[in-house]
From Swiss-Prot:
Function per UniProt: Uptake of Fe(2+) ions across the membrane.
Protein name from the UniProt record: Ferrous iron permease EfeU
Gene: efeU
Organism of derivation: Escherichia coli O6:H1 (strain CFT073 / ATCC 700928 / UPEC)
GO CC field: high-affinity iron permease complex
SUPFAM superfamilies per UniProt: MFS general substrate transporter
Residue ranges crossing the lipid bilayer per the database entry: 2-22, 35-55, 70-90, 119-139, 148-168, 180-200, 245-265
Keyword terms of this UniProt record: Cell inner membrane, Cell membrane, Ion transport, Iron, Iron transport, Membrane, Transmembrane, Transmembrane helix, Transport
GO molecular function, one term: ferrous iron transmembrane transporter activity
Length: 276
């Protein structure tokens, strides 16, 4: 529940910031009449992401067992790529995202008689990017942790992001966004490492990867996945009490370079904004 909550909170807050920045800029530049058009783009993006998620989830439920495992592995790999890209993309562009959005709005509203649709499409693509990232992560998360709690966590994360977005727009709160994105990014890298290890496990169960399947270590006597804390670790970080050598290797092969790249100072002009 916690991982879907945090990821969707972060993704939802990014989308809320985009919408808030666009709405604030339209109001500040005496173009508030276009805010309704902006919301059309938001709703279209939300409908696309929701429809795609439902379609993929319903379609894959009919797959045979091995094809299901293969699909789970592919979705996990896509989720790892998306989460990693999300972390480093936000780290790179967060300082200039406000200027970039304002320039995109100006460009959309200068395209002749059809600039309303240009604004709709600009907002649609900006919000849909965040939503599609969430869709593939949730597909991977729901496959690893079945039950009602992951969807509930995702809905709570989305609701929290919406509330925070409105409060930011109205000026009711100020968040240290730099710290928020920094610590959630670090957490996400560990989540992605667990997904990468889970992808190798899924590929093995699908019959595509049969190398290095010896048990690396057995922690069942110390931290069983049947215990409360073990279950939480499994749901959050993909913990396995008796992982294979290939799972452990993939975990380290992904995480160590990712952490090194993360702790290195960002290039000039790519530091995160402090607050909003």
């Amino acid at each position: 529940m916690f991982v879907p909550f945090l990821i969707i909170l972060r993704e939802g807050l990014e989308a809320a910031l985009i919408v808030s920045l666009i709405a604030s800029y339209l109001t500040r530049t005496q173009r508030g009449r276009w805010i309704g058009v902006m919301w059309i783009g938001v709703l279209l993006a939300a409908a696309l992401c929701l429809g795609l998620g439902i379609f993929i989830n319903e379609t894959t439920g009919e797959f045979p067992q091995k094809e299901q495992e293969l699909f789970e592995g592919i979705v996990a790999v896509i989720a790892v790529v998306i989460l990693t890209w999300m972390v480093f993309w936000m780290r790179k562009v967060s300082r200039n995202v406000k200027v970039q959005l304002e320039q995109a709005v100006d460009s959309a509203l200068q395209r002749g008689n059809h600039h309303g649709w240009a604004l709709v499409m600009m907002v649609f693509f900006a919000v849909a990017r965040e939503g599609l990232e969430s869709v593939f992560f949730l597909l991977a998360a729901f496959q690893q942790d079945v039950g009602i709690w992951p969807p509930l966590g995702a809905m709570l994360g989305l609701a929290t992001a919406v509330v925070l977005g409105f409060l930011l727009y109205w000026g009711g709160i100020r968040l240290n966004l730099g710290a928020f994105f920094k610590w959630t990014s670090l957490f996400i890298l560990f989540v992605a490492a667990g997904l990468a290890a889970g992808a190798i496990r899924a590929f093995h169960e699908a019959g595509l990867w049969n190398h290095f399947q010896e048990i690396a270590f057995d922690m069942s006597a110390v931290l069983s996945t049947h215990s409360l804390f073990g279950t939480l670790m499994e749901g959050i970080f993909g913990y396995q009490e008796a992982p294979s050598v290939s799972e452990v290797a993939v975990w380290f092969i992904y995480l160590i370079p990712a952490l090194v790249a993360f702790v290195l100072p960002p290039r000039a002009g790519a530091t995160a904004s402090r607050s909003m």
